[in-house]
């Protein structure tokens, strides 16, 4: 983001290419806790659908995070290229995201910022697997109750906006929003004005508009409806979502 840049580097011995996130310490001032949190989370996890941290090192001016190189670009870019996904392709993407999120939740980690920009394709291939990135806002449950409002407006769950104590369910809400976008090309909640947007989200008011949703299966709509539940207790968890027929 604003205090880092990512470069491709090559291991001198093995010739393997990696991504190196170069963080300028001076620009990081006041945001150290965010970075420390991201590193702590990444060190704890190992899953094929999550970007992996290989090592860290620092100089007097910079900090370097060596990560697996993914070259397929953001899910967001492919959505913009395609307009929408077929149900088969969309369900394959969402299945991988859910597998990764289930793993995170089992590890006691809530991502809190799932969105198409943070979902990357491992390679440019059509059938490339998806990996989750950007753990800057993620939180380990052992760090105490979650009540901080954070995330990206269009993907935030109602309970987060109402400043209630919240948990893993916020990630499932975000998966619901992403699923919706994959199938029709636009978000379920939208307003130029953030206050109006938040009102829509808090009421969980959205439609499967005609004609955009006319050819989408009832199964897909049912899947999304179980994720975009206003009450987090009624919302699907990862296991339930993965068992859904869609």
Provide a role label for each language-model segment.
Residues 56:
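Activation-segment/catalytic-loop signature of the eukaryotic protein kinase fold
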């Amino acid at each position: 983001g604003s205090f880092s840049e990512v470069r491709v580097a090559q291991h001198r011995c093995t010739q393997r290419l990696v991504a190196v996130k170069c963080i300028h310490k001076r620009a990081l001032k006041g945001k150290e806790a965010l970075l420390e949190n991201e590193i702590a989370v990444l060190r704890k996890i190992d899953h094929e659908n999550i970007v992996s941290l290989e090592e860290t090192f620092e100089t007097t001016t910079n900090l370097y995070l060596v990560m697996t190189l993914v070259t397929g670009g953001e899910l967001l870019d492919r959505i913009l290229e395609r307009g929408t996904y077929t149900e088969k392709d969309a369900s394959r993407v969402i299945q991988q995201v859910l597998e990764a999120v289930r793993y995170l939740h089992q590890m006691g980690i809530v991502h809190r910022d799932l969105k198409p920009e943070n979902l990357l394709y491992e390679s440019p291939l059509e059938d490339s697997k998806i990996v989750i990135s950007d753990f800057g806002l993620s939180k380990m449950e052992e760090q105490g109750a979650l009540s901080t409002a954070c995330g990206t407006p269009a993907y935030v769950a109602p309970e987060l906006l109402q400043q209630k104590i919240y948990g893993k369910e916020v990630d499932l809400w975000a998966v619901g929003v992403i699923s919706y976008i994959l199938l029709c090309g636009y978000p379920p909640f939208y307003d130029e004005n953030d206050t109006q947007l938040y009102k829509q989200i808090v009421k969980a008011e959205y439609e499967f508009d005609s004609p955009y949703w006319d050819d989408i299966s009832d199964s897909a709509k049912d899947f999304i409806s179980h994720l975009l539940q206003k009450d987090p207790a009624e919302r699907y968890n990862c296991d339930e979502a993965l068992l859904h027929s869609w």
